[in-house]
């Protein structure tokens, strides 16, 4: 973690100011932390990604599982597995590469050593 960004490998993801303030206040800048985000808070819509490009990541889809009204996408960021739940109208197949936008306003951060949630 560096000031203003969650960093994993070569990927930098901007942290919203509100979350950044409580991470700073509790001394978590430049410390290892865990980022948790629910599948429904990961988006493939261009309008979301364009509005917040610093919270989007490029991924290669490993599995795309159509589940009726939604599709579950399985991929990874710098070796860390993630799952995204997107609208089934998106025609995404395994091995496709796409940008996914992370809604970090809804993300949770955890202390790497204790695995306890870092609360505001």
Show which residues each predicted segment covers:
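Short aromatic-glycine-enriched beta-strand elements
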Residues: 3-5, 68-74
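C-terminal helical cap and adjacent loop that interface with cofactors, partners, or active-site loops
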Residues: 65
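Glycine/charge-rich catalytic "coupling/switch" loops of P-loop NTPases
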Residues: 3-5, 9-62, 81, 90-120
């Amino acid at each position: 973690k560096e000031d203003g960004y969650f960093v994993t490998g070569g990927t930098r993801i901007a942290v919203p100011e509100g979350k950044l303030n409580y991470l700073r206040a509790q001394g978590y800048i430049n410390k290892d932390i865990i980022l948790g985000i629910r599948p429904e808070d990961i988006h493939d819509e261009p309008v979301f990604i364009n509005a917040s490009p610093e919270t989007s990541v490029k991924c290669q889809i490993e599995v795309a599982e159509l589940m009726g009204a939604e599709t579950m996408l399985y991929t990874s960021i710098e070796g860390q597995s993630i799952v995204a739940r997107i609208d089934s109208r998106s025609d995404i197949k395994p091995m496709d590469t796409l940008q996914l936008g992370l809604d970090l306003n809804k993300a949770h951060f955890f202390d790497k050593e204790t695995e306890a949630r870092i609360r505001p």
